C-alpha cells in the first residue's frame, strides 16, 4: 500500500468515527424523515467575511441532549434534524455575539418528507461590543417551522420580531456606551 492510499483510508476512518459519534437525531433519518440544514456563518456588517465558529445543537423536546461541532474554516455548517421535535442551534465565533435559532419539525406531512426538506441559513453575527448584556441573546431570534400553505420551512415572523427588537436595542446601547456617547446602563431610545 502506498502512502497516498494509506492517507485516504485513514481519512475515511476518521470521518466515519466522527460521524458515528453524532447522536442519531443529527444523522439522516433511515426513512427520510429529517430536515437537512445547511448554512454559512458570516460577519453581519461584512457578509463576505466568513467566520469559523462553533454550533451547539440541542434536542430540546425529546432528550435535551446537546452536540457541539465546529464549522469549516470557511464558515460552512450542515446537520440533519429528525421529525417531531424542537431543536435549538447556537452559533458562535470568537469576539462575536452568540445567536440562536429554533427549529420545529412537528406537523410536517409525510408527502413533504418524501420530497425532502431543506433549510438554508445564512447566520450573521455581530462583533460583541464591551458591556453587551448577553441575556438578550439567550432567546432564539428566529423560529423555523413547516408552513403547510407554502410547503416548506419558514421562520415565524411574529415570534421573531420582539426578540430582534430587544436585541437591536441592547446592541445599539452597548455600541454607544463603548464610543462614550451614552451612559453604560442607560437604555437607548
List the model feature ranges, each with a label:
Residues 61-76:
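Short, acidic Ser/Thr/Gly-rich low-complexity loop/linker segments typical of extracellular
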Residues 90-106:
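A short, solvent-exposed loop/turn motif at the edges and junctions
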Amino acid at each position: 500500500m502506498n502512502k497516498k492510499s494509506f492517507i485516504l483510508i485513514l481519512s475515511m476512518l476518521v470521518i466515519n468515527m466522527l460521524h458515528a459519534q453524532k447522536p442519531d437525531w443529527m444523522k439522516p433519518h433511515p426513512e427520510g424523515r429529517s430536515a437537512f440544514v445547511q448554512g454559512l456563518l458570516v460577519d453581519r456588517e461584512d457578509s463576505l467575511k466568513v467566520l469559523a465558529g462553533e454550533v451547539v445543537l440541542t434536542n430540546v423536546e425529546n432528550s435535551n441532549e446537546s452536540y457541539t461541532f465546529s464549522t469549516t474554516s470557511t464558515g460552512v455548517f450542515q446537520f440533519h434534524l429528525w421529525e417531531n421535535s424542537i431543536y435549538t442551534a447556537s452559533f458562535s465565533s470568537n469576539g462575536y455575539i452568540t445567536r440562536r435559532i429554533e427549529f420545529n419539525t412537528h406537523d410536517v406531512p409525510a408527502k413533504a418528507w418524501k420530497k425532502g426538506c431543506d433549510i438554508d441559513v445564512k447566520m450573521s453575527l455581530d462583533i460583541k461590543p464591551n458591556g453587551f448584556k448577553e441575556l438578550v441573546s439567550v432567546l432564539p431570534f428566529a423560529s423555523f417551522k413547516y408552513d403547510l400553505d407554502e410547503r416548506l420551512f419558514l421562520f415565524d415572523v411574529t415570534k421573531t420580531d420582539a426578540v430582534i427588537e430587544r436585541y437591536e436595542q441592547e446592541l445599539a446601547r452597548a455600541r454607544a456606551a463603548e464610543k462614550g456617547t451614552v451612559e453604560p446602563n442607560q437604555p437607548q431610545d
